[in-house]
């Protein structure tokens, strides 16, 4: 715990965006202002910090944002911040703008030295990623919206797969973690779920299962494939050649990061944002 008195906090979002980030920003800004703090927003993440894209934020700046996807502050990845020179520059900019406390919403790759270079006091961060792959937390902002977006898309793909008696491979996000694939696979009743955690899958076994399902008269076959597994398009070609069943691949891509956040994401993000300000004032860091 730090004895430092916090008067002005910096607010940014970093890495990939996630639905609910705006709800978190809104909660941080309004809670901080309500406790007498000044709030400076940084556009475009750490890159914006180095470029001094810094604005004063008021309650009006976050009005009508809780329902919006994306992040009103924009976001970016910044390799310069991984260097000592970049970190020293950032620290000098924070001092220049009087930023003595910090809040961010970040994904799985927050800057490892963030707490050491930025401020000697507290720097609470809320987990913001649709991949649900941040340690020490059971929930990350954006996951619920993303999994519902993917679930609805997969339902639609199954409809047309049934009409044409196809095998469909639907690729969801998850380079290193398969939570989206797992949840979607269970929710959509998929025949197969392929995740990075089990990357040594048996394609021959999938082919055999498809052939067995066709013998039983099944009219579709759904495979949920996390992006970390590999090229869904080539997988579809191989499976079609091996089974004779028309096979199509659908890559959901960045649509999973967009859209109006669900009730759960709005509530969790709001709670996390407000609590982060309390922790910051108390001099605590998560």
Regions found by a protein language model. Name each.
Residues 26-35, 55-61, 116-125, 141-145, ...:
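A glycine- and small-aliphatic-rich helix-loop capping segment at beta-alpha/alpha-beta transitions
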Residues 101-107, 112-115, 143-246, 250:
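Accessory alpha-helical/coil subdomains and C-terminal extensions
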Residues 36, 40-42, 117-149, 194-198, ...:
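Short, acidic/small-residue loops that bind anionic groups at enzyme active sites
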Residues 2-3, 49-104, 109, 139-148, ...:
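Glycine-rich oxoanion-binding loops at beta->alpha junctions
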Residues 18-28, 49-50, 83-88, 104-116, ...:
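Short glycine/serine/threonine-rich phosphate/pyrophosphate-binding segments
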Residues 231, 239-286:
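C-terminal non-catalytic interaction/assembly regions of soluble proteins
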Residues 2-50:
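N-terminal phosphate-binding or glycine-rich loops at protein starts, especially the Walker A/P-loop
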